[in-house]
């Protein structure tokens, strides 16, 4: 059985009941609700597209509202992100992320016929039980990335530098980067996109036979090939999403790609999006901690360029 089931624990139980004790098809005829076929695999590609599209449209809407309010004159020509104050940019992103999560909390259960966190496989208890190891993994990942960056020539300027112009802005981006961003990005990439791409891969590679269709309808596990394909594809997208933050440096993008692969592995290994979010938050927290120490608690931000 794959470590990554497309549904919750109840579905895994139903799947196991439909199989013999040695993992072979049971010869007993299904009776009653105990042998009910598993529910549909979620989140699939349609669900992921809705989530991503809603996020993008909401972000654009907020940008247009800011332009209409006159907070960013000329933004239509120069781009909102370049003209808004860092605090306004963070507020816009935080509002987009939190609103999307809130809307998803109520919307997707109507499609999935189960609670949002169950369909997403958030599974906080699994992450909590391994919190020490997950945080340690995130910190170790941060150390390795810091070592790797010593061999990367940094760009003269990066868009993210705009968030470190004042001490207040620096603390705001730290809070956002260690709490809000990791949770949202893990929900998006490891909660929606990872299973969606894997489900699509398995469906497209499914033999068009009655036996294969029956197996698809009565199981919810994903094949290793599908998980590997999805982990690579989502990691490419993850790196590209952060490309502007690292000035599109190929070496830095490769580092981000590797980080995403580790997060995907954690997600699959633990079966918990909360677990990968914990690793992600610990990693981001370590990166910010290095800067905090370097700048004396953000009191000497000029040291970042030295």
Task: List each language-model region with its residue ranges.
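Functionally important transmembrane alpha-helices
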Residues: 61-64, 232-306
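Membrane-interfacial alpha-helical segments at the cytosolic side of multi-pass membrane proteins
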Residues: 191-202, 288-294
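Hydrophobic alpha-helical transmembrane segments
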Residues: 48-49, 90-91, 131-136, 171-175, ...
């Amino acid at each position: 059985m794959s470590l990554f089931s497309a549904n919750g624990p109840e579905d895994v139980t139903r799947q196991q009941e439909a199989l013999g004790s040695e993992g072979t098809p049971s010869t007993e005829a299904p009776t009653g609700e105990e042998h009910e076929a598993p529910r549909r695999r979620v989140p699939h590609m349609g669900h992921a597209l809705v989530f991503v599209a809603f996020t993008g449209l909401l972000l654009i809407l907020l940008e247009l509202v800011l332009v209409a309010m006159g907070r960013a004159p000329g933004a239509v020509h120069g781009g909102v992100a370049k003209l808004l104050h860092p605090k306004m940019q963070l507020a816009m992103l935080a509002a987009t992320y939190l609103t999307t999560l809130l809307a998803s909390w109520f919307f997707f259960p109507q499609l999935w016929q189960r609670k949002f966190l169950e369909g997403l496989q958030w599974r906080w208890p699994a992450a909590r039980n391994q919190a020490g190891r997950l945080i340690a993994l995130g910190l170790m990942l941060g150390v390795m990335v810091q070592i790797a960056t010593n061999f990367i020539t940094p760009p003269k300027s990066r868009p993210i530098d705009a968030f470190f112009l004042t001490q207040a802005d620096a603390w705001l981006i730290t809070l956002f980067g260690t709490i809000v961003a990791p949770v949202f990005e893990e929900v998006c990439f490891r909660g929606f996109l990872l299973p969606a791409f894997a489900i699509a891969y398995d469906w497209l590679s499914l033999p068009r036979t009655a036996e294969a269709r029956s197996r698809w309808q009565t199981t919810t596990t994903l094949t290793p090939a599908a998980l590997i394909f999805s982990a690579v594809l989502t990691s490419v997208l993850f790196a590209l999403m952060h490309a502007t933050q690292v000035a599109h440096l190929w070496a830095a993008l490769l580092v981000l790609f590797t980080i995403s692969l580790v997060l995907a592995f954690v997600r699959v290994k633990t079966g918990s999006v909360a677990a990968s979010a914990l690793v992600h938050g610990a990693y981001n927290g370590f990166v910010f901690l290095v800067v905090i120490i370097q700048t004396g608690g953000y009191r000497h931000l000029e040291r970042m360029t030295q």
